[in-house]
Each structure stands twice: as C-alpha cells, then as structure tokens.
Amino acid sequence: MDYTENRKVKNSRQARAMAKGTKFGREAQEAAWQSAEVDALYRLAAAGVRVPRPQQFIDGVLLMELVADAEGDAAPRLNDVVFTPEQALAHHATLIKEVVRMLCAGVVHGDLSEFNILLAADGPVIIDLPQAVDAAGNNHAQRMLLRDVTNLKDFFGQFAPALLGTDFGPEIWALYERGVLSPETPLTGRFQRLDKPVNLGDVMREIDDARDEEAARRLRMQSGEA
C-alpha cells in the first residue's frame, strides 16, 4: 500500500501480525494509523496549516477541536456545498496554498478531496490525515500530491471552469524538487512539459562532438607548449 511505505513498526510481533492480517494485526494497524494521524496533525498545526487542532489522544481516541460554521454548527464537507464561481476560485486558491504549506512541512495528504475538507466559518479546513505520507521518504509522494491537486481542480472546476485549464500540481512539485518552494512562492498554475522524446542518437553525437573538441583543445595546448 502506498501510504504505508517508509512507516516503521518497532515491535516485530506487531509487524508480523500486521503483515498476516490477523485480528491483532488489524488492531495494531488501526492504532498505527491513528498514531500517524496524530503526528501529522501536530506537525501541520505547528506549520500553520488549516487543520483541526488536536486536543488529546487517550486510549486510541483522538479528540480535536470542533470545526464550526458561521452558526456554530458542525461545518459541512465541501461536497455538500454549492459555490459561486468567485467562491470556488477563492477556496481553491486557499487550498492550493495549504497544499504548499503542507509540502513545505514535509507532508503530502495523500487522499485530499471535497470529502475530507470542511467549510468552516473562516474558510476550508483539511481533515482525515491517517494516510498522510512523508514527502521525502515515500516514493509515491509525487503521484499522491498530483492526485490531491487534481481532485481540487476537478471539484472546484465544476463551479469555476477556468480552473480546469490550470496545472498547479506539476508546478508545485517541480519547485519542491528544486528546493525553492516556500509558502510565499508565487504560483502561475502553468507548467510546460517536455513532451518531445529524447533522441539518444543526437545526445550521443553531442557527447562525441564535445569529446572531439576537448581533444583538439588539448592538442593545441600541447603544440603551443612545444
């Protein structure tokens, strides 16, 4: 499973039981996921990401602050709300910034969609983080981030079709890989892919030409010294 890559279980008995899928193993797996969610919530809350603030984790039960709407009731999920184009654009922009902030904290949600984002009185709040992965330690992190961003685009694009032409995911990941991504990095929503296939013959010819030029340069230098 993509989410579990690079997650370590120190107890060898638990690890074997989880691998076999026994009752004890399933319980251990559930506890591990709860622990992973707690760790992710604390980490992201410290980074300023819009997630519910964890209050306590007692006997395997995670208590979090209530995410409320303007009336003080439990905030709805995005999939239960209809937006104007302006609202969709604004909420999409907010969530793209949160995805960036998460990535800068080293975390990829891994299952981000309209079903696990609440609309609080002051804006969207991201929930459901047991499957969050370490951006640097999981080989599937890039694919997960691209999927998260695509889910946001597809959902809000229903209300603001202009979003369907954006390409924030690859842009964000490229900046992250180059080590220049920060929560303040301006994004364009555009990304130029190199769709042209690489011609290995041309590449090898360029290498040979460079090698010949270097050999000629060395020969000239030797002739000058003589």
Segments and roles (model prediction):
Residues M1-A74, V100, C104:
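Conserved ATP-binding subdomain of kinase catalytic cores across diverse folds
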Residues N116-D128:
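Conserved protein kinase catalytic/activation segment
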Residues G72-T84:
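AlphaC helix of the protein kinase catalytic domain
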Residues Q29, F83-L89, G137, A141:
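Flexible beta-alpha connector loops of hexameric P-loop NTPases
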Residues V67, D128-V133:
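Activation of the activation-loop gatekeeper triad in protein kinase-fold domains
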Residues A132-Q142, R147:
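Activation segment/activation loop of eukaryotic-type protein kinase catalytic domains
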Residues C104-E114, L119:
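Catalytic-loop of the protein kinase fold
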Residues E86, T94, R101-C104, V125, ...:
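Regulatory N- and C-terminal appendages and interdomain linkers associated
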